[in-house]
Amino acid sequence: MAEYVFLIYLVDIKYQFRENMYKKLEIIERAILLNPQYIQAFREKLKITQSKLAKESGISQSHLSMLEKGKRPATKLIATAVTLGLLKCFSSNNVENPIIELLDALSLLKFEDTFAEFVSEIIEKGDKGYLRLIENYPVLIISKENLLNEMRSRLEVMDIERIELSRGRIKVIGKHLDNKYVEIFLDCSDIRRLEKKFMKKTGKKVIIQVFPKDEVPPIYSINKDCVIIHCW
C-alpha cells in the first residue's frame, strides 16, 4: 500500500512539473508573439546562432532576421516554432535549463522596457523629483531606493527583492512567478542596449551612468547609490 501511495505521489509530482513547464513555455511564447525583437536576446542568452535557430525552428533565416529587427510581426505559429527551436538548439538533456535561461533573459528585457517606460514618463511630466539642470542640460538622478520602488510596482514577470548598483553595473535580485530565485545583471553591453531603448522611447540622445554612493561625482550633489541619465 505504501509503495502504491508513493507511486501516485511521484506521478502527481511529474504532472505538476509538466504543467509548470508548459506555463513557463507559454510565457516565453507570448513574449515572442508580442515582441519578436526579443528573439535575438534569447539567442544570445543561449549562445545560438541565427542560422542554427532558423534550421531548428523551420523558419527561414531571412524571415527570422526581419522578426528580430521588428520589421515583421510574429504569429502564434511562429512564436511556438521559435520557442521549440530554441529548446532544440540547447544541448542539455534537462529541458528546465534552457527554459530558466530564457525566463532570466525575459526578466532582463522586461526590466529594461519597464525602466525605459519609467524614464519616458519622468521626461514627459517634467518630474522635478528626478530632473535637474546641470550646466543647462537636463539630467535625471534616480536613487537606488526610488528605482527599486518604481520597478517593484511596475514589473510583472518577477518579484524584485533588491537592487544593487556598482560602477557601470546594475544587479537585480528577485523571484520568478514560480518562486525560484533569479538574478539579472545589466553590464556595459546591456546598458548600451538600454540607452538605445531610452533614445527610441524619448526621441533624445541618452547616456546612462551607474554609481555607488562613494563614487558619485560632487557635481550631482547626491550621496546615494544612483543611476544618472543625461538626455538632450
UniProtKB/Swiss-Prot annotation:
GO molecular function per UniProt: DNA binding
Ranges of residues in domain HTH cro/C1-type: 39-91
DNA-binding region listed in the record: 50-69
Database matches in SUPFAM superfamilies: lambda repressor-like DNA-binding domains
Keywords, sorted A to Z: DNA-binding, Transcription, Transcription regulation
Record Pfam families: HTH_3
InterPro entries assigned: Cro/C1-type_HTH, Lambda_DNA-bd_dom_sf
Name of the protein in question: Uncharacterized HTH-type transcriptional regulator MJ0529
Top-level taxonomy: Archaea, Methanobacteriati, Methanobacteriota, Methanomada group, Methanococci
